[in-house]
Amino acid sequence: MIKVYAPASIGNVSVGFDVLGAAVSPVNGALLGDCVTVRAAKSFSLRNEGQFVGKLPEKLEHNIVYQCWQLFCQHLGKQLPVEMTLEKNMPIGSGLGSSACSVVAGLMALNEFAGLPFNESQLLAMMGELEGRISGSIHYDNVAPCYLGGLQLIMEQGDIICQPVPSFDEWLWVMAYPGIKVSTAEARAILPVKYSKQDVIDHGRFLAGFIHACHTRQPALAARLMKDVVAEPYRTQLLPGFANARETAKRVGALACGISGSGPTLFSICNDIATAEEIAEWLQQHYVQNDEGFVHICRLDLAGARQIG
C-alpha cells in the first residue's frame, strides 16, 4: 500500500503570472492538500472520500485520479490493476491548486507503487500534460511546487521545466479561502487580450526584481516587488471583499497581499506570528463567507508531495 500527500499551492504568487508557484502547509501540522492511496487489486477501482468529496464529478471518467491512472498506464504501456482512494481535502475552484493536488498525488502514488518506472522530470511532464487537459492549456505553476515543494520558477526550456527559487524562512503566509468558487475559465476570460507597454515594462521589472531579491536575500525588497499588474486589477471584481481585505491586511502589517491563483483564496505575507494571527482573525470574521471557508497560517512547504503511508 502506498499513500501520498500533495500540498496546496499558490499559482502566480502575485508577481509571476503563470510562471511562479509556491507550495504551502499550515504551521500547526494540519494537512492542507489531497491524499491518494494505491493498493494491489485484481482490477481497477476508485473510491472517493474526504471533506470535499461532494464536489467531485459523479462520472468516473471525469474524476482526475481516474485520468491519472489512464495516463500512467498509457505511458507505462500496460494496465495496472489497482484499488485507488482519493481523499479530497481541497476545495475545488479555490485558487489553491485543487486539481494539481489530485494530479500530483495520483501520479506520484502510482509511480511509487509501480517501482518508480518514471524519473522526476518524466513524472512532472506527465503532471503538466494532465493539468493541461483539465484546464485547457499546460500550466506548471501549481503542479511543479506541489510536486517539488518550495517556490518554483517555471521555465519550460527543453527538459528544464522549472527551477527552485530561494525563499525566506521567516515569512508566514496567511491563506484565507472564503468558501465560494471562482471558475478558472471565468477568471482568465476577464483578463484583457492586450496590455499596455507600461504594464509589460512594470511586469518585467517586478518579476526580475523579485527573483533577484530572493537570490540576494533581501526579503523587504522582495515583498515590495510582489505587485500584480497582469491579473489582480481585473480579477478583483470577481472576489467580494478582496480589496477591503487587502487594505486591512497591509494596514495591520502584512508585507504583501495577493490573490492565490485565480482566487478566491487570498494570501497575506507576514514576518511575525502576532501580525499573522491578527490578520487571520480578521479574515476569518470578515472574508470567510460560509462554513466551507477557512483560514490557515502557513509556511512554504519545502518538501512538496511525499509518501505518508
Curated annotation (Swiss-Prot):
One of its GO terms (biological process) is threonine biosynthetic process. Its main location: cytoplasm. It catalyses: L-homoserine + ATP = O-phospho-L-homoserine + ADP + H(+). ATP binds at P91, I92, G93, S94, G95, L96, G97, S98, S99, A100, C101. NCBIfam families: PRK01212.1-4 (NF002288), thrB (TIGR00191). Belongs to the GHMP kinase family. Homoserine kinase subfamily. This is Homoserine kinase.
